[in-house]
Amino acid sequence: MLWVGRRAPAALEELAAKYAKRLSRHLPLAEVRVRPAAGRQGDARRALAEEAAAVRKHLRPGDTLVVLDERGRERTTEQLAGWLAERRRLGRTVFVIGSDLGLDSSLKNEADELFALSRMTLSHGLARLLLLEQLYRATDLLAGGQYHRGSLG
């Protein structure tokens, strides 16, 4: 998982670490924070291009690039679990979360998939926490765990 931005508030960081630890029991997880571009206020386009270049340095040939974007495809937990099961057989999947400026359109165009956690715009810290929790929930579901209880109605 690659995310562009500064560290989130301590409470979000603590919860993210909790879910990252749980998730690592089900699948290999590496998180990389990409620093936001310097001088971002003056030229947002340049900053986004620099941040995209920094993200690309962490990508390998054959990676499945999944960019988080509110216009992306939404999934239920069960759909995410099925999708993850398929992805695990096909190789490394890299999720990318943009900065407060978003992500450069070139990176979105290169993505194998745009994925939405919500139609709302989320801070990168909250998006990271939600993604970690949902990935843990989906992988625990695949492992037959009890964390996901699904709809009771």
Each model region followed by its residue ranges:
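RNA substrate-binding interface of SAM-dependent RNA methyltransferases
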Residues: M1-L65, D140
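Conserved RecA-like P-loop NTPase ATPase core
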Residues: M1, V66, G98, L131
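Structured adenosyl-cofactor binding patch, chiefly the S-adenosyl-L-methionine
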Residues: S105-G153
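Gly/Ser/Thr-rich beta-alpha loop segments that engage phosphate groups in nucleotides
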Residues: R7, E74, D100, D104, ...
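Glycine-rich, phosphate-binding/catalytic loops in enzymes
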Residues: K18-Y19, G82-A85, D112-E113
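Portal/gating segments that form or line small-molecule/metal binding sites
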Residues: G39-V94, L101-K108
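Short, solvent-exposed coil/turn elements at secondary-structure transition points
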Residues: R35-A37, R71, M120
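Conserved strand-to-helix beginnings and helix N-cap segments that scaffold or border functional pockets
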Residues: E13-A16, T77-E78, K108, R128
